[in-house]
Amino acid sequence: MTQTNPNEQSVELNRTSLYWGLLLIFVLAVLFSNYFFN
C-alpha cells in the first residue's frame, strides 16, 4: 500500500488545471470590465 495511486495524481493535476482556468477567467473578466467601464 506504499505505492501511490496514479488516479490520485491525475485528479491532483485536474484540480490544478481547474484552479488555473478559474484564475484565467477571473483575470479576463477584470480586464474586460475595465475595458468596458472606461
Swiss-Prot record:
Organism field: Gnetum parvifolium
Family: Belongs to the PsbL family.
Recorded GO CC terms: chloroplast thylakoid membrane; photosystem II reaction center
Residue pairs linked by disulfide bridges in the UniProt entry: none
Name of the featured protein: Photosystem II reaction center protein L
Keywords, comma-separated and alphabetical: Chloroplast, Membrane, Photosynthesis, Photosystem II, Plastid, Reaction center, Thylakoid, Transmembrane, Transmembrane helix
Pfam families: PsbL
Lineage of source species: Eukaryota, Viridiplantae, Streptophyta, Embryophyta, Tracheophyta
GO BP annotation list: photosynthesis
Subunit relationships: PSII is composed of 1 copy each of membrane proteins PsbA, PsbB, PsbC, PsbD, PsbE, PsbF, PsbH, PsbI, PsbJ, PsbK, PsbL, PsbM, PsbT, PsbX, PsbY, PsbZ, Psb30/Ycf12, at least 3 peripheral proteins of the oxygen-evolving complex and a large number of cofactors. It forms dimeric complexes.
Transmembrane segments: 17-37
InterPro entries in alphabetical order: PSII_PsbL, PSII_PsbL_sf
Location relative to the cell: Plastid, Chloroplast thylakoid membrane
Chain's role: One of the components of the core complex of photosystem II (PSII). PSII is a light-driven water:plastoquinone oxidoreductase that uses light energy to abstract electrons from H(2)O, generating O(2) and a proton gradient subsequently used for ATP formation. It consists of a core antenna complex that captures photons, and an electron transfer chain that converts photonic excitation into a charge separation. This subunit is found at the monomer-monomer interface and is required for correct PSII assembly and/or dimerization.
Membrane topology of the entry: Single-pass membrane protein
